[in-house]
Regions:
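N-terminal regulatory/effector-sensing and dimerization cores
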Residues: 2-92
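Acidic-enriched, low-complexity/disordered segments with a strong bias for Aspartate over Glutamate
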Residues: 11, 37, 59, 76, ...
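Intrinsically disordered, low-complexity regions
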Residues: 33, 40-41, 64, 92-95, ...
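General nucleic-acid-binding
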Residues: 72-120
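A short, Lys/Arg-enriched amphipathic alpha-helix from helix-turn-helix/homeodomain DNA-binding modules
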Residues: 102-106, 111, 115-147
């Protein structure tokens, strides 16, 4: 098994760890979860689903059950990436499973990440694979930035 890690890249935390049965919880953050070795079971909003990847919106009750390590992308609700996930991946749903082949590719991409530079490259590739790169470059309101 790979060593656990946590990397902050831009406004996301990328966490690889193995938590076999965490308690169901909810918080003010969205998640993307990817299998690193084999599919996991997610319990989301009372529904059990087996997946290689899942997007979970903010304030949605959830837990992921897996003996194998997973990659969890923790995304604060107030960030541009959270808006991208809502618009591109969730599309109005509280959660949505992600394409298996894309999810497997993301898990594979992160398998050998060990440094900040590796993490930055893997995060950019993850955004590209999920179609989040273009959406993320939305213009900020300059009036807010000046305040």
């Amino acid at each position: 098994m790979n060593e656990p890690f946590i990397f902050r890249v831009s406004d996301c935390y990328y966490i690889q760890a193995s938590y076999p049965s965490p308690a169901e919880h909810r918080h003010f953050a969205a998640h993307l979860v990817f299998a690193m070795e084999r599919p996991f079971t997610a319990l989301v909003n009372g529904v059990s689903v087996e997946a290689a990847g899942i997007a979970i919106g903010s304030d949605v009750p959830h837990t992921v059950l897996s003996e194998a390590p997973t990659l969890v992308v923790f995304i604060d609700e107030l960030t541009p990436m959270s808006r991208c996930v809502k618009h591109t991946l969730l599309r109005g749903a509280p959660w949505r499973t992600l394409d298996t082949s894309v999810s497997s590719e993301v898990g594979e991409r992160w398998r050998d990440v060990r440094t900040e530079a590796d993490a930055a490259a893997a995060a950019a590739e993850t955004e590209r694979l999920l179609g989040l790169q273009e959406q993320r470059t939305s213009a900020e309101d300059p009036r807010i930035l000046e305040a």
